[in-house]
Amino acid sequence: MRVRGLCTLLSIVMLTAGATQAAAEPRHARNDEAIDYHEWSSGSFFAGRLDGLGFGYGGLRITHPAGSVAHTEPGLGTTRTYDYGTWTSPKYRQGFDATQLIASWNARTPAKTWLEVQARGRTSAGAETTWYTMGRWASGDADIHRTSVDGQSDANASVDVDTLATKAGVTLRSYQLRVTLYREQGSPTTPTLSSLGAMTSNVPDRFDVQTTKPGRARGIELKVPPFAQNIHKGQFPQYGGGGEAWCSPTSTEMVAEYWGRKPSAQQMDWIPADYQDRSIVYAARNTFDYAYDGTGNWPFNTAYAASLGLRGHITRLHDLNELEGYIARGIPVITSQSFLSSELDGAGYGTAGHLMVVVGFTQAGDVIANDPASSSDGRVRTVYKRDQFEKIWQRTKRHTESGAVAGGPGGVVYLITP
């Protein structure tokens, strides 16, 4: 289960068919794992079924609405009528029986618009699942409160924030995605969907992984701007409790600004002008998941990057050698990890869930990370031992301080590119 309050630190001191984005060189998976990312965009949208949507500048848009619906937004106290249209993907078979699915999307949602993404699968036993809601999303928060949907669980699967996980003994042989675009009735604006995809995986339970040998990215360090989340500790607590929990948007903003994209001064005019690193606060607000009550919803972060004009999706990587392929081509990678303070030398904290940016590798092959869990921007750059880092990122099971067994990220990454 994903931990609420992701990135809150326990301090002791303080591949793929259909995917065009940033595909790394082909690799063979370990014998015990399978990972796939598949994406529909541009011309590949023609393979799906349209109802009320059409092709326009930048992607799919509402053209002749399929219908209208009244939507009540409890957090805003509003009920509005929205026109809508849908796109449903063809069935996609990933080539193995999957136990997890994480959807990602890139879209523009101007005022008075939003979208909903759903997924369903066909199990290896031949049963078709229900449609599960993977997120209701808008780049802003004036029309809806972007949210994951709690309480989705049945005999086949359950949804934990952003991750569809099958029940014991159930696997997905194939899946479909569906997106519904909404615009307020009478509004001339429309949301625009530029891409929709999903990562599927079957990664076995493992407490440890074999350390890879240093590869092609030795001695490469990308100039990713460093931002520290702890500068914002206790600030703007309405967004997940404050900066101490903002590892995900801080990491996402670092990569966005590496690519030369950031919110405009006008977009940040609600933040005091003399506040340090204002873009981090903006990123926190615009990744905040109102049901999860935090900023660590993975696809909400890549969707935020896309709202700045970039492209992003969630996937898993097999190991550090695969990650090195991205660094060698100038692409920083955001990784998810969880660990005890004793498991990562130099961190000075333990965490049930944390995001940081891999920006390079030393000549010896150790990991150079921009770790946002720092007291100042000048202390963000950190070198971590290769074997320790690979373990805490790749494992799917771990022991907590009390000795209990908890989950691990299994190689999850955010990939964000121009």
Question: Could you say what each language-model-derived stretch is?
Answer:
Residues A29-G54, T79-T99, A107-S194:
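Beta-sandwich interaction modules
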Residues M1-E25:
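Secretory targeting and sorting signals
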Residues T113, C247, H354:
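Histidine-centered active-site/metal-ligand motif
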Residues A34-G75, R93-F96, E128-W131, G169-P226, ...:
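Noncatalytic regulatory segments and standalone regulatory/sensor domains
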Residues V69-Y84, H313-L317:
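Extracellular beta-rich ligand/substrate-recognition surface
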Residues T180-G294:
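Active-site-adjacent structural segments surrounding the nucleophilic cysteine of cysteine proteases
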Residues A273-P418:
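Conserved active-site-adjacent core of cysteine acyl-enzyme catalytic domains
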